[in-house]
UniProtKB/Swiss-Prot annotation:
This is Large ribosomal subunit protein uL4. Belongs to the universal ribosomal protein uL4 family. PANTHER family: 50S RIBOSOMAL PROTEIN L4, LARGE RIBOSOMAL SUBUNIT PROTEIN UL4M. It comes from the Bacteria. GO terms for cellular component: ribonucleoprotein complex; ribosome. Pfam families: Ribosomal_L4. The keyword Transferase does not apply. The lineage of its organism: Bacteria, Pseudomonadati, Aquificota, Aquificia, Aquificales. GO terms for biological process: translation. HAMAP family: Ribosomal_uL4_B (MF_01328_B). One of the primary rRNA binding proteins, this protein initially binds near the 5'-end of the 23S rRNA. It is important during the early stages of 50S assembly. It makes multiple contacts with different domains of the 23S rRNA in the assembled 50S subunit and ribosome.
Length: 200
């Protein structure tokens, strides 16, 4: 598949996207991110006396047991949230298919740009040079995901102060961030690693 003058492999960049698969993987990613530390105290856990607050009969009031009951202020919470792990499993093959589908959605929209090198010749980070690169491609006003072969501090710091721009090495490439972006800026050397990673 030819995108912006670069030949891309069809089994990675020309896969028919299926919404339910992409939705599944995005939901899985967001679930994995959740802390799950939400917590409330039940009537057994709140700090107050468990003594019956008034006699059962003779007062004219409704029957009550302990002050820790949920109907009192400061009492326990019934069926409240407790700490839990939201993570669940998706097969590796399913995740690879979703990654190929996400990349394909960008390729079909001509939103994939491949560069021979990404600021690798710079000795130190330069935001101005990074912004000029985006302007040259006509994507300076878009949400851009920059994909590098490996972790590259010069590239990361150069793009860091540009709004709506993320930098990820191939090992961190994921469906959520690909779908978030309007355009993908991929380093030439990263393509082979992407092919290795998807490897359907």
């Amino acid at each position: 598949m030819l995108v912006n003058g670069v030949e891309l492999r069809d089994d990675v960049f020309n896969v028919e996207p299926k919404k339910h698969i992409l939705w599944d993987v995005v939901r899985w990613q967001l679930a994995k991110r959740r802390q799950g530390t939400h917590s409330t105290k039940t009537r057994a856990e709140v700090n107050c006396s468990k003594k019956k607050i008034m006699p059962q009969k003779g007062t004219g009031n409704a029957r009550h047991g302990a002050r820790s009951a949920n109907i009192f202020v400061g009492g326990g919470v019934v069926h409240g949230p407790t700490p839990r792990d939201y993570e669940y499993k998706l097969s590796k093959k399913y995740r690879k298919i979703a990654l190929a589908m996400a990349l394909s959605t960008k390729a079909k929209n001509n939103s994939v740009y491949v560069l021979e090198s990404l600021l690798s010749s710079l000795g130190k980070p330069k935001t101005k040079v990074a912004f000029e690169l985006l302007k040259e491609k006509g994507i300076s006003d878009k949400k851009v995901l920059v994909v590098t072969k490996d972790q590259n501090d010069i590239v990361s710091k150069s793009f860091k102060n540009i709004p709506n721009t993320k930098v990820l090495p191939v090992v961190g490439l994921n469906v959520y961030d690909i779908l978030w972006a309007d355009a993908l800026l991929i380093e030439q050397g990263a393509l082979e690693k992407i092919y290795e990673r998807v490897n359907l």
